[in-house]
Amino acid sequence: MEGNGTENPCSRTLGWLHQNNDAKPWLWKFSGCFSLPEQTLPLSSQTKEYMENKKAAVELKDIPSPLHVGSKFFPAVPLPDIHSLQQPKVQLSAIPKVSCCAHCPNEPSTSPMPFGGGSGSSGRSGSLIHTGSLLDSPSTGTVTCQVGSDFAFQSVSSLQNASARNNLVGLASDLPSMCVDSNLPSCKHLSCCGKFHFQSCRSNVHKLHQFQTLQGCTSAGYFPCSDFPSEAPGHLEEHLSHSELTPHLCTNSLHLNVAPPVCLKGSLYCEDCLNKPARNSIIDAAKIWPNIPPPSTQPAPRAVPLCNRCGTKGMEKETSLLATSLGKAASKFGSPEVAVTGQVLETLPPIGVFWDIENCSVPSGRSATTVVQRIREKFFRGHREAEFICVCDISKENKEVIQELNNCQVTVAHINATAKNAADDKLRQSLRRFANTHTAPATVVLVSTDVNFALELSDLRHRHGFHIILVHKNQASEALLHHANQLIRFEEFISDLPPRLPLKIPCHTLLYVYNLPANKDGKSISNRLRRLSDNCGGKVLSITGCSAILRFINQDSAERAQKRMENEDVFGNRIIVSFTPKHRECFEAKSSNAVVDKAKSPKKVKNTKLCLIKDTGEQSPSAKAMPGKGLQANSGSATKNTNFKGLQELCRMEPKSGNRIRDHQQGHGSLATLPNSGPTASVPTLKNTGVRETLHRSSQKKENLSSQSIASSPAQKKKREGTVFQISYPSAFSQLIASRQVSPLFSSQSWSPRSMSPNLLNTASPLAFNIANPSSAADCSDPFANGVDIQVSNVDYRLSRKELQQLLQEAFSKHGQVKSVELSPHTDYQLKAIVQMRNLHDAICAVNSLHRYKIGSKKILVSLSTGAANKSLSLLSTETMSILQDAPACCLPLFKFIDIYEKKYGHKLNVSDLYKLTDMIAIREQGNGRLVCLLPSNQARQSPLGSSQSHDGSSTNCSPVLFEELEYHESVCKQHCSNKDFSELVFDPDSYKVPFVVLSLKVFAPQVHSLLQTHEGTVPLLSFPDCYAAEFGDLEITQDRDKGVPLEHFITCIPGVNIATAQNGVKVVKWIHNKPPPPNTDPWLLRSKSPVRNPQLIQFSREVIDLLKNQPSCILPISNFIPLYHHHFGKQCRVSDYGYSKLIELLEAVPHVLQILGMGSKRLLTLTHRAQVKRFTQDLLKLLKSQASKQVIVSDFSQAYHWCFSKDWDVTEYGVCDLIDIISEIPDTTICLSQQDDDMVICIRKRERTQDEIERTKQFSKDVVDLLRHQPHFRMPFNKFIPSYHHHFGRQCKLAYYGFTKLLELLEAIPEILQVLECGEEKILTLTEVERFKALAAQFVKLLRSQKGNCLMMTDLFTEYAKTFGYTFRLQDYDVSSVSALTQKLCHVVKVADMESGKQIQLITRKSLRPLTVQLLVVLMSWEGDAYLPVDELKRHYETTHSTPLNPCEYGFMTLTELLKSLPSLVEVFMNDKAEECVKLTSLYLFAKNVRSLLHTYHYQQIFLHEFAMAYTKYVGETLQPKTYGYSSVEELLGAIPQVVWIKGHGHKRIVVLKNDMKNRLSSFDLSPVNHEDQPAVSRQILEVPEPHLASELHLRTGPSQMEQELLQLANSSPVDLLCAPVPSCLPSPQLRPDPVILQPTDLIQFEEHPQEPLGVLFLNQEEKTEIPIPVKKGNLSCNSSPSSPASASAPPKPSSEAPGLLISKDAVESPAKKQPKNRVKLAANFSFAPVTKL
């Protein structure tokens, strides 16, 4: 059959009842099944996918006669009236024949069984075969058979004889794998319909979707609905849920009272079959069959029906089956065909579906099959499907979606996604073809929202007269919607889609290659085989001798490879390829290699399965075993309404099935295979029951789990080898169940999981393990039998509990039945819910659909709970063992065990589960209660973590109650107790008083360890003072409780020592680990660790600390706890809210913060030493931070403490008697201790932060402002900062990034932004007052801008504020009492105007900040003084220069500093040493300052861009590096200062032009500092540009007697010759040019009035001061004393209006590339100075 069709990927060959003559006794091939290979039934070429052929109707003339095929298939079977079977192929109008009728004989001895031989769509009923003849049929070849039987049982009436029924049942059990596919790929029918549809598979029967059959036709592989023997129906019912028992029809005419048959589509039915009701219930026909009007066509003439078996003629009267009589029989896939009297009605109007799946896509993880089904069910009523096409790029679309569409017979057209509108063009083409092919009336369904289809829809509707149905999304265009007759929203159409299940799970298949050359090396052969099998995905596993094993990903690939490789040449040898090994050694090698491969790649094993063939050993001729195989999990798109069944359901089903199997085997000597009971896995055949023998053998041979066999019981010694299966689970939930259900499979055999071999516990894959004994599996309970718990977190706590429960109930009820909804109490804003659903399938659907579903204002997080209800016994045994191993004598009272268990693991314990652990624990009755004891075989500790040798923790250390190792302990020490007559019966616990001591912990600690050493590690607390007195003298016990520390608490302050409670209630002082701690152990490792608790207990522990720290000495009587709690917190302490019934239980639940002292009713409550140390550390850090020097001397500690906390210092408040005792407990990473003048100094340990960390902290301060501005009232709890920061910015707040180790330290590093307020234990973060007003101003601007006219009535302020920002406005947050006072503080933002209707708040009109920015830049760039300028000085210079006051409020800022801080890219604001606010230019604008000065030396203040770099280098004295400023080129750098320059032009003609606003030159006298001596040095500090040292100075002296002539005087202060010295930058160039005649307007009157005034000043000095005797009378004479260094180069002042032509511009002296106007400073030859550039 391999050439006739393809098989299912999970199929495999089956062994048959007769073996080949040349086969080994242990090997079974698939030979002998049929007579001749050429007589096999021809297969379709497309049997892999049952829906690949879209044609709904098939000509019967193309199909061979069913009886003819049956006769060819089984020639040895004698048939009556054989002449009636030899007839030509039937035509469409011919009457098909009924299989048999009541007139046919039924002999009990040779009960014939109707065997489906073909497709029911052609009206065939199958052939009749006898059991004996079938078994005796010879075979000559190997035939691959497919799973899914087409056989049918006879009716009960014809099987009255018991033997006949037994024979039939045995044959039915032995032949589960016989199936012959027909040539019709669309649907395959049997003569008699039934309930189970079996997919083609090789060894296992997989239940697929129960297809709703056509009228009178049933899908292939269905059992008869009513004709099961007495045992078979019940056997099959065990594996079906009630929902899967759908109504069905039967076509069998084997009833005794034969009525006229009724024909539908070529099949004949008797009245009994039609009138018989369904097995379970009658379904309303109106709900089953679509309401399609009956066609008006006339049925074709019919002949008299004739029985296919005996030739008896029936009646001529025929009855047509209509919708009202048969019920719904529409196909799930493909077009609903309405067939009456064998003819397909072609008169129905056509319908075409055109789906733009890229526009209206299938939701992620949802089933495309359901979408197609809904389209067909909604629109195809009364129509015939003519077209169903979707267009997409299949390489971009989900492969599973494409596969589902192919399975649904949808045409998937591929287009290139990169081409523009390719999908739309293809769909428009399909629409036009549809219009050309079909005529009205016709219907077009377009699934798209694209407006491009509007033209086509309009044409189809108005020109062709088609009915247009548009399935669109919400955002569809009106132009598109206008052209449709019917509109349907796509969102509603795809609502509640079920999740898409995986189509198939790949299974690895092995292929064996023989006849390989022996003289070649393995690598060459491997390469050759790999080349032959590469196209099929083969992998060479091993090469042994002349054979090799190849692995393929599925069966199809292996079959293709077999065809390609068969008889191929491999180095001169013709190889033979087979699915079965030839020798036993080959099989063993294959199994070992498979195990190795799985061990190497466990991840691959999780997703795939290896189909292994297991050796069956020698067996008797009467009992032949078929090769075993791993379970095949198959869940495809056709699966619907199936329940997820885990391993436990399979285990529960196995005992009944196994017993029936064994009965059939013993009665008939055949092997039975069970039909699958679930969509995910099959039930394997289990014949062996010896679990202990299996485990014993596995421990001896160390066999791997996947290849070991299970021994049989003594009654079945001859059937020694069985089948061991691997079970693979399709989902992670099932894997979770499986991993926890291994142990219960063996619990009933009294087998301890501790004795399991390591190979069993640590296999390569957690999914593979043995199912040992079916009978033992009967005790396994379904973990989800009582419902499935779903945990819902991130629930909106602002909603009421009732509203939340209702919303959750409504949301989850859409996905299945909800059993209960439970909410956790409101505590610490951590509200969670537990929703219990009916089954696992509904729970999985709910988790997939509702995860991150928004309820209220939050998106809930949904996950499947794995709580106590789903815990397996194996996990319970581990937890029980860990508790009992740490208990005294490995025993605990039952009530104490339950208490510890529930507190340790956080969930309830079912006591009945403990009785199931009979192999591990024993529960004994003792006295008035029960005792839980660990069996001796399990008392050894599992790991050193729980052993007495461990010093890093103990399980008892984390449990609320600590027990002594003995069940009973003496109340007092008999040796040292002063009261020799002490008796427990007489002792009254209420009379005990807790002693208070005054001791040093350094002295007391070694004494206690010594005392425990002499008392063998335990000292009763009652006699501790007596024992201590006997060893070291009397204790210093004080009667004043306010001056001492409780002895019981003081003992627990010693590292490694604790006080435990024995089971008789006696408190005992003991070592934590029952031995002295090592000398070098960290004390913190010896403290009790915080147990993992729920949020309620964490909140309660904080409240306990806050309550007790306000009590004297942190001690509180237990009787006063409730009233003080109520008084302190203003609420009741409800113990039930925390899950407890008694207060003492609640107090014991927080042992890491609360210690209970004493006994009886006079017990005292205090904080543990660990909590006290933590509390003292916080107080100490607060005290140190309050000091200016961040340190304090121990002698001044009391005074500093009083100043900081406003109360006297008392060391007993922290549970110790000496300060040094508790300081020594603080880690060195927190504080630093140093010695200073015989006194100890305590200081905070800090490290210097880098400059990068400081810059990051500045950025962090901006983030904090942004975060808190989004919080109500600009404040938030401290503990919410980190999650809020992460949520707001989408990144983690890493403290090390800013140079801190604690968040509080980081927040305290920005005191100008943030304040940390403490309200008891809770810390609140809020903005400072300045930042609050800034934030409020921004809110007011937003609020007023949203109002009409940018104004708001004052009376409406609070209402509009709450409406806009979601919380009320509080005046007290801003320290004001009225809105008017508030507006005065916000005068830079709002103003109050008196209107007729009242006072109105108006938004002021701000001035533009851009002109002011330019003006401030000019002032700063013209400043010739220090590198920075005080803010006040800047304001004064601005007002002096522009003669206008500078009011920041006009620009929307309260102060000038805030205004400058809003320009971070231009200036920097900082505090100098004098605590003055100063401002300076940024490094980028210092560069801009130099550019401005450079351009001022050029004519028209512009320069070519390509000359700029060289000119700048000459001018400044250093090379221009744009990368220094963070830019890659000069052009980008200049573009970063748009306020100063701009670039115009193109190409090489681009020029750099100074902005007009920057051309103004301010007076140097106004901006220069008074002291000019230090200016050059300071100027060099600004830009740090080294200036060349000039050895000579050139002075221009002008005096009263020298006014008419100019004298150049050279003053040489260096011995070096002037010519050898560097040329000064201001020295005139030797190039001489005549002055151009330039007429300039001059004031001649002013010129004649002062003829002898100096007209210019020339500076030739760079470093030393210049002598400038200038009489300043009228006007401002430029005194540019700054050198032309890059740091201080500034523009000369603007010429005075009185004498514009008298002043020398700097251009005339320093311009390097332009002709100068006529200079007022003349030399002898009347030549002007040439351009001079700086060196």
Curated annotation (Swiss-Prot):
Subcellular location, principal: other
GO biological process annotation, one example: regulation of gene expression
Bias-annotated ranges (Low complexity): 1681-1700
Alphabetic keyword roster: Differentiation, Meiosis, Oogenesis, Peroxisome, Phosphoprotein, Repeat, RNA-binding
Domain HTH OST-type: 872-946, 1000-1076, 1096-1170, 1172-1248, 1256-1331, 1332-1407, 1408-1482, 1483-1557
Domain of life: Eukaryota
RRM domain ranges (all copies): 788-867
CDD domains referenced in this protein's UniProt entry, alphabetically: LOTUS_2_Limkain_b1 (cd09978), LOTUS_3_Limkain_b1 (cd09979), LOTUS_4_Limkain_b1 (cd09980), LOTUS_5_Limkain_b1 (cd09981), LOTUS_7_Limkain_b1 (cd09983), LOTUS_8_Limkain_b1 (cd09984), PIN_limkain_b1_N_like (cd10910), RRM1_LKAP (cd12255)
Annotated NYN domain residues: 351-488
InterPro entries per UniProt: LOTUS-like, Marf1, MARF1_LOTUS, MARF1_RRM1, MARF1_RRM2, Nucleotide-bd_a/b_plait_sf, NYN, OST-HTH/LOTUS_dom
SUPFAM superfamilies listed in its UniProt record: RNA-binding domain, RBD (SSF54928)
Gene Ontology, cellular component aspect: cytoplasm; peroxisome
Basic and acidic residues composition-biased segments: 657-666, 693-704
MF GO annotations: CCR4-NOT complex binding; RNA binding; RNA nuclease activity
Ranges for region Disordered: 617-639, 657-720, 1671-1718
Subcellular compartments: Peroxisome
Compositionally biased residues, Polar residues: 673-688, 705-715
Residues annotated with Phosphoserine modification: S65, S757, S1088, S1090, S1568
Quaternary structure note: Interacts with LIMK2.
Summary of the function given for this chain in its UniProt record: Essential regulator of oogenesis required for female meiotic progression to repress transposable elements and preventing their mobilization, which is essential for the germline integrity. Probably acts via some RNA metabolic process, equivalent to the piRNA system in males, which mediates the repression of transposable elements during meiosis by forming complexes composed of RNAs and governs the methylation and subsequent repression of transposons. Also required to protect from DNA double-strand breaks.
Name of this chain's protein: Meiosis regulator and mRNA stability factor 1
Originating organism: Rattus norvegicus
